Amino acid sequence: MKIWLLVILLVGLPAVLFAQPDYIEVNAPGNRQLKLAVEPVLSPDGSSPPDASRNSSEVITNDINMSGVVMAEGRSLQPPAGNTSLSDVNYAPWLTAGFDMLVRSELSLQGDRLVVEFRLFDVVNRKMITAKRYLGVAKELRRFSHSFADEILRALTGEKGVFTTRIAYVSAQTGNKEIYVMDWDGYNPLPLTKNGSINLNPDFSPDGREIIFTSYKRRNPDLYRRPLSSPVEVLLSNSKGLNITGSWSPDGSKIALALSKDGDAEIYTIDKDGSRPTRLTIDPALDLYPSWSPDGKQIAFVSDRMGKPQLFVMKASGGDVRRLTTTGNYNVNPRWSPKGDKIAYSRMVNGAFQIFTISTDGTSDSQLTTEGSNENPAWSSDGRFICFSSVRSSGNGVYVMRADGSGQKNVSQTKGKYFQPVWSAH
């Protein structure tokens, strides 16, 4: 067995396996970047509400700034630019202050239930753009704020945001490699596995309700499936040897993975219940890391059939294999963009991994990271962002960046080692 494959068996770090729209136009050429003010949440009487609401404007501001679409700022005008009615806005002071849009929100209680109303206003044209009302408990306010940030992005671009989505990842913070899930911005981390073994390669189902992952809990790297809402784990594949790098098909009916039951690792598909294993690659080299195209017709994967690990693409049924990467000697971790036009991956550059994207015809290759060592890129469902694991002097963790490499941000809330983040679709 080749040395670089042995690493996953002993260490469990797969990244080193291989030696005219109905919305506001914000991107018109020549336009300056628009500015959005986000007021603090108020109670109906105009006073500041309980502590639970204090982070709401910060959540919305951070979400919108991460999008890069407009510049958001948590801001209140003194004296107030309007009265306590959400709809009664004095636009002139906001316009004078240089803002184009305004978010106002109000929090109240109905018995033991929290009622939050958000409104987005067009300051320049003096009108309301959109509004949303939420009913729940106090701990849901952060989620409500993310949800309204999604609606703001929909109003600005025509596409809903991904700020209510989650990221699954592997962490060794307990001494064992367990799988966790957190909000996209790193808040509310929760363990999904607690078996004290090595757990790797999480991947969300297309509906975001389940994950698949590989676990060594039975002393063999087997593939499991479990819902996020239940601790029940279903064994999908326990062939002798590797059952790793599972990837859910876009329609949720199949899973592509690497199996070594016939010798070297090869790409197979199985049905979502683990049945009907079908071999796709037939090559004496190692083939791993399958990633489906968004239309489900192709699969990208990694192979060292040319001597060094490179990215290849084939039909989802196998065959018509073509080499994608021609630059670099160590290219791994392919992830197909939801938009279908690019594949993100990791390349070894001067002894460290960096994140790249390449067009699906191989003609355009762009480096997105330069600091530290960066691995395991995964796209958000709208193709606007990429999450990845990073080891750098400014802090290790799960990072998020825009698809062009800008806005790199460590979203991990605790110190430790983080691996293999993957973004949910919902």
Model-identified regions with their sequence ranges:
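Hydrophobic beta-strand positions that form the internal "hydrophobic ladder"
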Residues: 167, 211, 252-256, 296-300, ...
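Residue-level detector of Asp-centered blade-edge/turn motifs that repeat once per structural unit
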Residues: 162-163, 206-207, 250-251, 294-295, ...
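Multi-bladed beta-propeller domains
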Residues: 183-200, 226-244, 270-288, 314-330, ...
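Short beta-strand->alpha-helix linker/helix-N-cap micro-motif
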Residues: 23-91, 103-109
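Structural motif
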Residues: 113-115, 175-180, 220-224, 264-268, ...
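Amphipathic beta-strand/beta-sheet edge segments enriched in Tyr/Trp
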Residues: 21-22, 84-151
